[in-house]
């Protein structure tokens, strides 16, 4: 699963996801892409599940680009522990995704295969998405 090799700080604030994506809202690598329509935290496990669903449907043909990276450490305290006594340990890694962000890109397969692969990937994610196609080719 994806996670940073090293970080400047071990833990981060929760924060909020406001506004729309400034960058990363256009297709850069592939012909087909999966665009987020809602703000949400996407975990490394969800990214990996979506990637596996796509590559399995594409039968390892074509190419997949993952345009998001889980760089946000999410902490949790153990079960049945009283409040206080500091912040919990890092439980998993996540990525803040804003509306308009391209999360995955595909190239090298036919349009029906690409659309179905992206649909299967979208089912693994907790947000509404849209399949986008590069128009300038």
Curated annotation (Swiss-Prot):
CDD domains per record: Ribosomal_L16_L10e
UniProt entry tagged with the keyword rRNA-binding: yes
Pfam families xref list: Ribosomal_L16 (PF00252)
Keywords: Ribonucleoprotein, Ribosomal protein, RNA-binding, rRNA-binding, tRNA-binding
Single GO BP term: translation
Family matches, as HAMAP family: Ribosomal_uL16
CC annotations in GO: cytosolic large ribosomal subunit
PANTHER family in the record: 50S/60S RIBOSOMAL PROTEIN L16, LARGE RIBOSOMAL SUBUNIT PROTEIN UL16M
Listed InterPro entries: Ribosomal_uL16, Ribosomal_uL16_bact-type, Ribosomal_uL16_CS, Ribosomal_uL16_dom, Ribosomal_uL16_sf
Subunit structure: Part of the 50S ribosomal subunit.
Signal sequence coordinates: none
Coiled-coil stretches noted in the UniProt entry, renumbered to this chain: none
Name of the featured protein: Large ribosomal subunit protein uL16
PROSITE patterns for the chain: RIBOSOMAL_L16_1, RIBOSOMAL_L16_2
Taxon lineage: Bacteria, Pseudomonadati, Pseudomonadota, Alphaproteobacteria, Rhodobacterales
Family note: Belongs to the universal ribosomal protein uL16 family.
GO MF terms held by the record: rRNA binding; structural constituent of ribosome; tRNA binding
SUPFAM superfamilies, alphabetized: Ribosomal protein L16p/L10e (SSF54686)
Known role: Binds 23S rRNA and is also seen to make contacts with the A and possibly P site tRNAs.
